[in-house]
C-alpha cells in the first residue's frame, strides 16, 4: 500500500470534513477531530 492509499483510507474512516487538525512525528499521525462519534 502506498502513501496515497493510506491517506485515502484514513480520510474515508474519519470523514474528510471531520478533521480539524493534524500533526505527525516519525512514527505517529495524530488527528484532531471535530466529532469522534462518527468514526467508522
Curated annotation (Swiss-Prot):
Catalytically driven reaction(s): N(pros)-phospho-L-histidyl-[protein](out) + sucrose = sucrose 6(G)-phosphate(in) + L-histidyl-[protein]
Description of its domains: The PTS EIIB type-1 domain is phosphorylated by phospho-EIIA on a cysteinyl residue. Then, it transfers the phosphoryl group to the sugar substrate concomitantly with the sugar uptake processed by the PTS EIIC type-1 domain.
Keywords: Kinase, Phosphotransferase system, Sugar transport, Transferase, Transport
Alphabetical list of InterPro entries matching this protein: Glu_permease_IIB, PTrfase_EIIB_Cys, PTS_IIB_1
GO molecular function: kinase activity; protein-N(PI)-phosphohistidine-sucrose phosphotransferase system transporter activity
Any matching Pfam family: PTS_EIIB
Presence of keyword Kinase: yes
Domain PTS EIIB type-1 per the UniProt entry, residue ranges: 3-40
Organism: Lactococcus lactis subsp. lactis
Signal peptide: none
Enzyme class: transferase
Protein's job: The phosphoenolpyruvate-dependent sugar phosphotransferase system (sugar PTS), a major carbohydrate active transport system, catalyzes the phosphorylation of incoming sugar substrates concomitantly with their translocation across the cell membrane. This system is involved in sucrose transport.
Any single GO BP term: phosphoenolpyruvate-dependent sugar phosphotransferase system
Protein's UniProt name: Sucrose-specific phosphotransferase enzyme IIB component
Amino acid at each position: 500500500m502506498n502513501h496515497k492509499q493510506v491517506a485515502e483510507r484514513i480520510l474515508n474512516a474519519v470523514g474528510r470534513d471531520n478533521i480539524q487538525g493534524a500533526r505527525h512525528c516519525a512514527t505517529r499521525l495524530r488527528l484532531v477531530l471535530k466529532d469522534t462519534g462518527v468514526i467508522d
